[in-house]
Amino acid sequence: MIIPWQQVDSETLDNLLEAFVLREGTDYGEHERSLEQKVEDVRRQLVSGEAVLVWSELHETINIMPRGAFRAGAEELP
């Protein structure tokens, strides 16, 4: 189920974004980006609708994923 990011408390959203970025461990190539920059990148994706907050009833977890992956039914993958 998609959770509208606008309805999430700002501090909670900040914590979700930071936890997501730290968990992903994405390699940005030659130029390392700060945690704050990575968090803002993900925030922009949420605002633009490219990414969505998803609640998994199966796993009782919240995740951030590309909108297209959610539509493809990937929200219940481990």
UniProtKB/Swiss-Prot annotation:
It comes from Yersinia enterocolitica serotype O:8 / biotype 1B (strain NCTC 13174 / 8081). This is UPF0270 protein YE3952. NCBIfam families: PRK04966.1. Coiled coil: none annotated. InterPro entries: UPF0270, YehU-like_sf. The lineage of its organism: Bacteria, Pseudomonadati, Pseudomonadota, Gammaproteobacteria, Enterobacterales. It comes from the Bacteria. Belongs to the UPF0270 family.
